[in-house]
């Protein structure tokens, strides 16, 4: 009976993870295609749309790297003992995750600089040079990426030494847990940046509402609505990102447990929810993407009815 319940839970988690992968890939490919088509039609593209497109592409690559690692661990776990395979999987995961997180952070910076209202001269300069601010942010992220790659190389070398010396599986898993813990540490930097943008947006909204109370203006003006929409997008990103970081930390702390157990699959399902859920939020929160998604849904409904009419 216990075995049956365990099997049902295992299949349920695998199904959830599979659906998350499918929805995540379709959602991010959709975001990228909409922006590419719009770019081709107009002959130009805004910096924000470029960030959306880059984020969607990096998220798609990240999900594909997760699928690859998941299939390798499921179908042939022995490959994880090979230095080349470990290096390939870890670096591909780390690079795609790095850019997907940093591009999302750049979106938070764009929202903050576009929506927030401060009279500070430094803020006004940053607001005017928003593109340069994002460019500098990406350059800094590349420096952090290089540092992360150095750590990854040391990790794979150590793992190879353990394999050659026939070290126990627990030692290998401890090294992998250390890798996850360190990688999580590197992802905390963009999280701190996004959290700062969120807090500054709240402060900007509070000041704006305070000024409106003094001037006896209505509470739902354009600036207030923009603040609220920006906060909704950023806070959703932070919540999903927090769940993602916690899943990585939990997996690194529970790494001595067999990696195919229910807890591991549950943590992976939480991790995959980050790139999947955030892409859905971006589609719903962006007017162009939302309109394009409605057009696709209407087209699919029309095709479905057309097929039904031709049926027997």
From Swiss-Prot:
Alphabetical UniProt keywords: G-protein coupled receptor, Glycoprotein, Membrane, Receptor, Sensory transduction, Taste, Transducer, Transmembrane, Transmembrane helix
InterPro entries: GPCR_Rhodpsn_7TM (IPR017452), TAS2R (IPR007960)
Membrane disposition: Multi-pass membrane protein
This protein's encoding gene: Tas2r103
Subcellular location: Membrane
Source species of the chain: Mus musculus
Similarity comment: family membership: Belongs to the G-protein coupled receptor T2R family.
Protein name (record): Taste receptor type 2 member 103
GO cellular component, one term: membrane
Topological region Extracellular: 1-6, 83-92, 154-185, 251-264
Any further remark recorded for this protein: Several bitter taste receptors are expressed in a single taste receptor cell.
Sites carrying sugar chains: 166
GO molecular-function terms, A-Z: bitter taste receptor activity; G protein-coupled receptor activity
Principal cellular location given in the protein's record: membrane
Superkingdom of origin: Eukaryota
């Amino acid at each position: 009976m216990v075995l049956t319940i365990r099997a049902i839970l295992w299949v349920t988690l695998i199904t959830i993870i599979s659906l998350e992968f499918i929805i995540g890939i379709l959602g991010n490919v959709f975001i990228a295609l909409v922006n590419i088509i719009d770019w081709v039609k107009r002959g130009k593209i805004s910096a924000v749309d470029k960030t959306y497109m880059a984020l969607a592409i990096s998220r798609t690559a990240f999900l594909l790297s997760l699928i690859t690692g998941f299939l390798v661990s499921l179908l042939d776990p022995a490959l994880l003992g090979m230095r080349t395979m470990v290096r390939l999987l870890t670096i591909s995961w780390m690079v795609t995750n790095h850019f997907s997180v940093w591009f999302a952070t750049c979106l938070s910076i764009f929202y903050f600089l576009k929506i927030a209202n401060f009279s500070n001269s430094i803020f006004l300069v940053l607001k005017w040079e928003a593109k340069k601010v994002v460019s500098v942010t990406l350059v800094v992220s590349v420096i952090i990426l290089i540092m992360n790659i150095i750590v990854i190389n040391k990790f794979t070398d150590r793992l190879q030494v353990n394999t050659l010396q026939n070290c126990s599986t627990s030692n290998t898993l401890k090294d992998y847990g250390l890798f996850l813990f360190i990688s999580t540490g590197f992802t905390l930097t963009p999280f701190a940046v996004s959290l700062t943008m969120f807090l500054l947006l709240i402060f900007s909204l509070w000041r704006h509402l305070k000024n409106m109370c003094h001037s006896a203006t209505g509470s739902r003006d354009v600036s207030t609505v923009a603040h609220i929409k920006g906060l909704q997008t950023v806070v959703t990103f932070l919540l999903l990102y927090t769940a993602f970081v916690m899943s990585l930390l939990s997996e690194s702390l529970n790494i001595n447990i067999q990696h195919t157990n229910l807890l591991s699959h549950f943590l992976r399902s939480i991790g995959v929810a980050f790139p999947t859920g955030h892409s859905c939020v971006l589609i719903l929160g962006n007017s162009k993407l939302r309109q394009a998604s409605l057009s696709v849904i209407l087209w699919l409904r029309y095709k479905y009815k057309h097929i039904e009419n031709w049926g027997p």
